[in-house]
Design a protein with these regions (language model features):
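ATP-dependent carboxylate-activation loops
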Residues: 174-195
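Short, charged, surface-exposed secondary-structure boundary motifs
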Residues: 2-9, 54-56, 115-117, 228-229, ...
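Active-site nucleotide/adenylate-binding loops and adjacent lid/helix of ATP-dependent enzymes
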Residues: 3-87, 97-101, 126-138, 142, ...
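Peripheral (often C-terminal) accessory segments that flank ATP-dependent C-N-forming ligase machineries
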Residues: 195-281
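Conserved hydrophobic/aromatic beta-strand scaffold that supports enzyme active sites
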Residues: 57-59, 80, 168, 217, ...
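Phosphate-binding core of ATP-grasp and ATP-grasp-like enzymes
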Residues: 73-78, 83-126, 134-166, 172-180, ...
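Short, flexible turn/loop "capping" segments at secondary-structure junctions
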Residues: 48-49, 117-118, 251-255
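Short secondary-structure junctions
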Residues: 18-19, 147-149, 236-239
């Protein structure tokens, strides 16, 4: 099961299927890592070979930063070093039955990478897209077969490059994190928790997952001078806001101090709401 736990093994699985990946491998000592940095060029990305999401991920821009990383890293952890990919993160997600048939699939689009959000103390948003790109579904379907995904949720991450091509990032045989399960529900007026229970108990899946709405998480941080108050946002778009909450401090660097979950049937309306929440003076 290494290929569902270790990023280095995932990379090999992606290549077996014929999907492009970022150049990289597990590193040894400082000199080994420095040699790869010279081969790929700065910046590079270093992250635990075994881990979830962006936890303990570092963007390294120089030899000095590389030296600092080796000074503070966990000595008992294996790390993988990769070339830095400049692209937008998109996902191929969903659920399969016991025979590996796709019961529904979905895609998320992230406005910026987690590293950029933390580095710049920036706001972020990501949304459930109503429209599934054909190339994403084609690649995702191949991965489901390669990883033999049966009766479970899946969450495959990719970079969408400026030229439109895809580079595989990570495979997770679980639902996406955060509020994504709830966002799928709000995007469909569905109850996936009950639907999954029905699937496990009876083998049937009756949820209607046609995505009549876009659904988006939008963050706010207390340090930014927003043009519109929360009250003004709610007065104009309260009917589109399905959740507003104060985030626990442990999640604030990524998810913001406050989070809105919004939905809209049309893309432009979604972008208009995001703009009103996010625009600063």
């Amino acid at each position: 099961m290494a290929f569902v736990k270790l990023k280095s093994a995932m990379k090999e699985k992606f290549k077996e299927v014929g999907i492009r990946v970022a150049r990289g491998r597990v590193i040894g000592d400082y000199q080994d890592a420095l040699g790869l940095c010279h081969e790929y060029g700065f910046p590079v990305c270093i992250k635990p070979d075994s881990g979830v999401g962006a936890a303990a991920t570092h963007k390294i821009r120089s030899e000095e930063e590389l030296g600092h990383f080796f000074h503070v890293k966990n000595p008992y952890e294996s790390y993988i070093l990769e070339e830095f990919i400049d692209g937008k993160i998109v996902t191929y997600d969903g659920l399969t039955d016991a025979n590996g048939n796709i019961l529904f699939d979905a895609t998320l689009v992230y406005e910026k990478a987690v590293l950029e959000t933390v580095e710049k103390n920036a706001d972020m948003f990501y949304y459930v897209d109503r429209n599934m790109p054909d190339d994403l579904r084609e690649i995702g379907t191949k991965l489901l077969q390669a990883f033999n995904v049966r009766e479970r949720f899946f969450h495959f991450e990719f970079f969408r490059l400026p030229d439109g091509s895809l580079v595989a990032l990570e495979a997770n045989l679980r639902p996406p994190g955060g509020h994504t399960m709830d966002m799928w529900n709000w995007a469909n007026d569905a109850d996936l928790y009950a639907a999954y229970g029905e699937l496990v108990a009876t083998g049937n899946f009756t949820a209607q997952m046609h995505f009549p709405y876009y659904c988006c998480y939008v963050s706010r941080k207390g340090v930014h001078p927003y043009r519109f108050t929360h009250e003004e946002v709610m007065a104009r778009y309260g009917g589109n806001v399905v959740l507003f909450e104060e985030m626990p401090g442990i999640f604030a660097a990524i998810m913001g101090d406050f989070g809105y979950v919004i939905r809209a049937a049309e893309y432009q309306e979604l972008m208009d709401i995001i703009h009103m929440i996010s625009v600063t003076e």
